[in-house]
Amino acid sequence: FSYRNYLSQKVFPNLDKDILDINNNYKPDLILLGHNNILQKNTLIELKKKGTKISLWYEDHVANYGPNWRNNLSLIEKNNDLIDTYFITTHPDVIRTKINKNKLNFLPIPVDKNIETLSIYKHKHRYKDLFFALSHGVNFGGLRQNTRDERENFLNNLVKLGKNINFHVLGINNDKPKWNYDLYKEMMICKMSLNLSRGKPLKYASSNRIASYVGNGILTFIDEKTKFHDFFSKNEMLFYKNEKDLAEQINNIKNDINRINKISANGKKRYFEIFNNLIISDSIIHKTLGSTQKYKY
């Protein structure tokens, strides 16, 4: 169940009591807190009495220059003496926190063959050059009002520089974000995509759109300051310095469909080789429980 049931719909009025009851029934080795940290301290103490490990994964910004980063960091720092491991979508080296650094681990956004099912590079009718979908949170129904989003400045500059580029940008000019298959349909008419997250580009930091793009086989551009070139070569992903450099790279490749398709296919293959859901799950279990790892990472 989702913790949001407790906070909004109040389907289960006694969250901590229910968690303790479930724990007594199943006696788990590991409890994984998914993008939340709302259990009371006494509840965590009780859960750990029989050796249960507690881990937390978190996707939002917890380093400077990202939206709401202070609140996000405060949230995960709560009860950090009782949480055994953390998995965050930014390299731990760039985070200043009271959490013991040995507990912090980088969490790549995983792909799943049952979700990232497309091979967009195989589609014949892709008449748009570059795809980008702007949103203010996963599955948030619309764009938040009165929210300053620096990505719009980046996109406006890019459009001005790319007069000969056929853009397909969703989520601006009051256009509501699209999700799931509706999003996939929009991606399938495009040759390339832009992975642009809110905030300052930081080492290994990315929103979960990167899995949707690369995992579905569409050539993806990402800021070189994220250092994703540690994982991907220029035959699997393309890296830009700024808006001008990005516009030049797009113009240089947009008519070379064979090269676009090759990079797209290579990127999808590589992403599934190193960041699929089985590997990421195994790394969480191994790093938290000390179990034998099944994969190299």
Predicted regions and their residues:
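N-terminal pre-catalytic "stem/leader" segment of glycosyltransferase-like enzymes
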Residues: 1-61, 85, 280-297
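Nucleotide-sugar donor-binding catalytic core of glycosyltransferases
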Residues: 1-4, 10-18, 26, 34-35, ...
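Conserved acidic donor-binding segment of nucleotide-sugar-dependent glycosyltransferases
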Residues: 237-244, 252-257
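Short, well-ordered alpha-helical microsegments
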Residues: 39-43, 94-95, 247
